[in-house]
């Protein structure tokens, strides 16, 4: 979670 993986996680 945080920058660009927020949508995957």
Swiss-Prot record:
Keywords: Pentose shunt, Schiff base, Transferase. Pathway: Carbohydrate degradation; pentose phosphate pathway; D-glyceraldehyde 3-phosphate and beta-D-fructose 6-phosphate from D-ribose 5-phosphate and D-xylulose 5-phosphate (non-oxidative stage): step 2/3. It catalyses: D-sedoheptulose 7-phosphate + D-glyceraldehyde 3-phosphate = D-erythrose 4-phosphate + beta-D-fructose 6-phosphate. GO terms for molecular function: transaldolase activity. GO terms for biological process: pentose-phosphate shunt. Its EC number is 2.2.1.2. It comes from the Eukaryota. Belongs to the transaldolase family. Type 1 subfamily. Transaldolase is important for the balance of metabolites in the pentose-phosphate pathway. Homodimer. This is Transaldolase-1. It comes from Cyberlindnera jadinii (Torula yeast).
